[in-house]
């Protein structure tokens, strides 16, 4: 795991869409993460960390 990935994961825990945006910009992953974060903060975090690590 590189330093950029660690920073993205930390941002994904604090504000999930920001961490995903840094890697995928306005792609499908970002919009899914934003929707999950709006519907429930914890699902947004789980999805963001999953997308960034896998």
From Swiss-Prot:
The chain crosses the membrane at residues 2-22, 34-54. Pfam families: Pmp3 (PF01679). One of its GO terms (cellular component) is membrane. Expressed in shoot meristems, mature leaves and roots. InterPro entries: PMP3. Keywords: Membrane, Stress response, Transmembrane, Transmembrane helix. This is Low temperature-induced protein lt101.1. It comes from Hordeum vulgare (Barley). The gene is LT101.1.
